[in-house]
Structures are given as C-alpha cells and as structure tokens.
C-alpha cells in the first residue's frame, strides 16, 4: 500500500457553507429541528438566507472537510465532487486546492447551481443545517476519476450522497475499483435522518463494501434500530473490519473484531461550533490508519483534530494540525 499515490480519496457533496449564529426561536419559527440536516430547494434556501442575517462563507461538504483535514495534516488527499461553473463553484475549487488536496472534477456548464448549506449555530454550539444540494447531487459514475480511486490507500464515501441514485452507482463503482486495487473503503453515515431514509441499503453497503465505518451515536443506533449505544456496538461488531463511533463529549469508541477501544475527548478551549467535529475526527483517524498507527492511536488522532475544530467557527481548522499533534501526542 505504500506505493499508492494518495493516502485518502474522498467522494462527496461539493458545498459552500454559510455559517450564521442563530437562536432557538429562529429554528422554531422555521420549523427546524436542532442538530439535524434538512434538504431544501433553491427557493427555500434563498428565503432562509434572507432572514438569517450575515454569515461566514466557507467551503464545506462533509467528505471535503475530511480530505482538507488530511491534507492539512500532511497527508496525500484527493477529492471528487461536482460543482457548477459559477462563483460558488470557483470558491469551492480554490479552497480545497489551497489546503493541498487534489481536485479535478470538471465543473458542470449547465443545470443546477453549486450546492450551498446554511449552518445555523445556536449558543450551545449545536449546528442545524439547511442544505440545497444543487449541482453536487448530479454526481454520477462519469464524474469519477477511477485512476485516482485506484491509487488511494483508502476511498472515503460520504453518506449524504446516498440520497442520489446516480451517486449510489458511483459509490459502488468506485468501491469496486478501490478494493480490486488493494485499497480499503471507508464510509461516513453522515446523518441519522439520511440513515433512516436508506437503512436497508446502507446495511447492505456496510456488509458488502465497507472496511471502515464512521458514525455518531444517533446514526449507528438508527442504522440498526437499536435501543441503546451498547446494543448498536454489538450489532455493528464484525460487519466491517473497523467501526469508529463518536459520542460528542463522551469521546469515541473504536471496534475491530473482539477489540474495543474507548477514546476520551480532547477539551482544547470553549465549545464554539460543532460543525466539523465528525469530519475532522475522520481526518485524524484516517491519517493515522494510512500511516500504520494502531487503532487506539488513530482514535486519539481523530479526537484531537475534532477537539481543535469545535473551538472555532467553521469546519476547517484555522490552527496548525501538525503542531497540535506534536504538542499533544508527540
């Protein structure tokens, strides 16, 4: 695996985030459930933006955030995701390339505009997302750079894209190429509502194609309709080689075969915004995994990266991640 050109290649939604600080009343007035992601059409997105107030514009997308984190750590990262040839598409492409990730998916010249996500951050640091998927949902097998996929130690798939039939086909095609070339396949479940919409097909994907599964407590219990986190642990155990399951302030649990590792969280400052926590956990974990670190160390790397990003507004760390690792993990 050391001869691969990329440590991790990710496939996901190419989105520009608009982060806005809001209160619970705003969520109630717009019938939004705190801490979840809701899909909206372009008209709904425009109305929400107009009423939300000024925001911070930054490139996002769950898998894109993870790959940006891996690149910031010094890993060799590539990303596949569709944008339109518009202003937001140019912003997305510039930002992910600027952190050192390879991004060469051609921009669409017609059709829906580049995806955007309004992220409402409440005073308790919870984020509630309203996402217009736009051009990103049009990703299909023709958009895949299969040479890049074949050259990845790990192919990382974003569960949010599972809402698109074309993207499902792209996922399966990419996973088959990755595995046939000796790579591993990792999946992030992304959102509990997304899991509930596609429970059976997600279970089949995990059982048949996934080596490393990332999920939070809500997502993993939704996947197996479990009554508790502990029950979900036993249901996922053995279905894939590795499961890395995050639990917010309770840290994370990493499973592999009969092994179970409990990873404490890192508290690096006041909690500001949890938007990129899961994405950066996956970045740290996969960075460690592609360097041959043991699973407990991988979990610690993920926990530290997540601990850093939640102390700031926005999903991509503004601090030096290599310096952070050197300071806390040696």
Predicted regions and their residues:
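Conserved phosphate-binding/catalytic region of the ribokinase-like
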Residues: 1-9, 14, 28-34, 177-180, ...
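Conserved beta-alpha-beta core of the PfkB/ribokinase-like small-molecule kinase fold
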Residues: 154-234, 250-252
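A glycine-rich helix N-cap at a beta->alpha junction
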Residues: 95-112
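Glycine-rich phosphate/adenosyl-contacting loop at the front of the ribokinase-like
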Residues: 1-80, 90-91
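Alpha-helix C-terminal capping segments
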Residues: 67-76, 120-122, 288-291
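Conserved phosphate-binding/catalytic loop of the ribokinase/pfkB sugar-kinase fold
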Residues: 104, 108, 119-164
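Hydrophobic beta-strand scaffold residues
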Residues: 77, 103, 185-186, 243
């Amino acid at each position: 695996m050391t001869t691969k050109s990329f440590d991790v290649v990710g496939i996901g939604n190419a989105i520009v985030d608009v982060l806005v600080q809001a209160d619970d009343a705003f969520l109630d007035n717009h019938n939004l459930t705190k801490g979840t992601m809701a899909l909206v059409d372009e008209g709904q997105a425009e109305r929400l933006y107009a009423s939300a107030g000024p925001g911070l514009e930054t490139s996002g997308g769950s898998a894109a955030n993870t790959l940006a984190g891996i690149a910031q750590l010094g890993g060799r990262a590539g990303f596949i995701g569709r944008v339109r040839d518009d202003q937001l598409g140019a912003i997305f492409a510039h930002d992910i390339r600027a952190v050192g990730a390879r991004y060469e998916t051609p921009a669409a010249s017609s059709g829906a505009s580049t995806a955007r996500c309004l992220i409402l951050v409440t005073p308790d640091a919870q984020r509630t997302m309203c996402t217009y998927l736009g051009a990103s949902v049009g990703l299909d097998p023709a958009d895949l750079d299969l040479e890049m996929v074949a050259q990845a130690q790990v192919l990382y798939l974003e569960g949010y894209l599972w809402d698109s039939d074309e993207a499902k086909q792209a996922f399966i095609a990419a996973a088959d190429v990755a595995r046939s070339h000796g790579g591993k396949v990792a999946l992030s479940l992304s959102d509990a509502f997304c899991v509930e919409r596609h429970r059976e097909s997600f279970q089949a994907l995990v059982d048949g194609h996934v080596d490393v599964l990332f999920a939070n407590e809500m997502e993993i219990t939704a996947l197996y309709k479990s009554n508790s986190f502990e029950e979900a642990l036993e249901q996922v155990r053995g279905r894939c080689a590795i499961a890395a399951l995050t639990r917010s302030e309770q840290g994370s649990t990493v499973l592999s075969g009969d092994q179970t590792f409990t990873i404490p969280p890192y508290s690096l400052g006041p909690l500001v915004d949890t938007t990129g926590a899961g994405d950066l956990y996956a970045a740290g974990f996969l960075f460690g995994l592609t360097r041959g670190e043991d699973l407990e160390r991988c979990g610690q790397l993920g926990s530290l990266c997540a601990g850093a990003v939640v102390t700031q507004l926005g999903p991509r760390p503004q601090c030096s991640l290599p310096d952070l690792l050197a300071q806390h993990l040696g």
